[in-house]
């Protein structure tokens, strides 16, 4: 009997190893002179060779239009925000639509919107310039958005258990705010600036029900006469826990939302260093004496620099070298071409 169980265990181990070994890595690039398996994500999705569990790397210099991720794969970009040179980064100059349950996207720059149409999607370390949306009226559950930069996250009324952690959600232009229509979601250790600036009123959260908001730094805009905009936090939101956040409202709101820190100002320099790079993490690091220090649950800091999914500078994927600078001369010198690469 003991030998039987040993054989069963060995068979299970071999099967697991076979599944791991079966997963393949693919490279996508359309940059001139770069050899790759496919010229676009769409082309990779159309290939019968690319299967569930594979990893697709988008190489430096790759510039694509709108793409659809239609298989349960992991798509890994180059990170974002560290260089203006097209030869050093990969970009999606359009929208990304995810239609495969269980797909994961890491370190990708998207100039448009990311439409999430299925359950169990993970976005990590991405910059989604024009916002993250639930792209369908069908129910979409268990989405995870970690350590990204975007302008808003908008779901529909049919979603549950989204996790939104350690993101920069900055200056959303939507009428109804930076976070919308979330149910039973966890919103934790984010920095949210909703419609910052004069005479820009947008709601911070609209129809966010049965959610948990904790360890965030939440800043609204100001009115046209410079007053702190008070009326549009957590509008039409019910049964929501709001605790251990730093919020740009007067302390008179303590009775409504006890256990938070109220700054009575939209001056973010009292909370953050406000120097250096946003993408690199310096700008939104906490300044000396910041009210966000130790203000989180368990006396951790509020904001994006702590926690299991703390903000990663430039959205760098793990174990992927970042090319900060690439200099290639137009012509050789003394029959040699000297290429300079800075990592």
Which ranges hold each PLM region?
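Predominantly extracellular beta-rich ligand-binding scaffolds that present long acidic/polar faces
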Residues: 114-116, 133-137, 147, 152-280
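C-terminal accessory segments
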Residues: 259-317
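Short, compositionally biased P/S/T/A/G/V-rich stretches that sit at domain boundaries
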Residues: 302-337, 342
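Acidic glycine-/aspartate-rich tracts in secreted/extracellular proteins
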Residues: 31-34, 61-64, 79-83, 221-223, ...
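Bacterial Sec-dependent N-terminal signal peptides
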Residues: 1-25
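Acidic Gly/Asp/Thr-rich repetitive segments characteristic of extracellular carbohydrate-active
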Residues: 24-63
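Right-handed parallel beta-helix/beta-spiral solenoid domain characteristic of secreted/periplasmic
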Residues: 64-66, 72-116, 125-132, 153
